[in-house]
């Protein structure tokens, strides 16, 4: 097989014909060998760099991918109040084993306080199908209205007398 230097490759023209003794079979074998080596290198790289679900990072931001976390569990009771349930750290079996190994004494057991978060209820849960009692309704308009003309007339009458 003929080997060329970089300068010789730049001087070659694509329109030139191949040499008479060019061996295409050997050339194809070299190409297949290079393809196999590249495939093995990719497999080795992928086996060591499996992080972030095997995705490659894009080159325009050079940052780590953002991994979405599961939403916290929120329960809504019959009154419409939503309560956040914090994730318990550790398993309950470990706590039971620790209490069994300690001797029975008057040592207070530390408990983990569960944090709760109260949220305003939805307006749809507040509405009612029952009509409101008329005695509970506060009137917006005043019962006794003020008439300015009547007040002016009454002042005039007081002055005349």
Curated annotation (Swiss-Prot):
One of its GO terms (cellular component) is cytoplasm. It comes from the Eukaryota. One of its GO terms (biological process) is positive regulation of cytoplasmic mRNA processing body assembly. The modification Phosphothreonine is found at residues 99, 101-102. The modification Phosphoserine is found at residues 78, 91, 154. Phosphorylated by casein kinase II complex (CK2). Belongs to the CAF20 family. This is Cap-associated protein CAF20. Residues 52-72 have a biased composition (Basic residues). It is found in: Cytoplasm. Interacts with TIF45. Its main location: cytoplasm. Present with 26900 molecules/cell in log phase SD medium. Acts as an inhibitor of cap-dependent translation. Competes with eIF4G1/TIF4631 and EAP1 for binding to eIF4E/TIF45 and interferes with the formation of the eIF4F complex, inhibiting translation and stabilizing mRNA. Binding affinity for eIF4E/TIF45 is 10-fold less than that of eIF4G1/TIF4631. Required for induction of pseudohyphal growth in response to nitrogen limitation, probably by regulating STE12 translation. Keywords: Cytoplasm, Initiation factor, Phosphoprotein, Protein biosynthesis, Protein synthesis inhibitor, Translation regulation. GO terms for molecular function: eukaryotic initiation factor 4E binding; translation initiation factor activity. The gene is CAF20. Residues 52-108 are annotated as: Disordered.
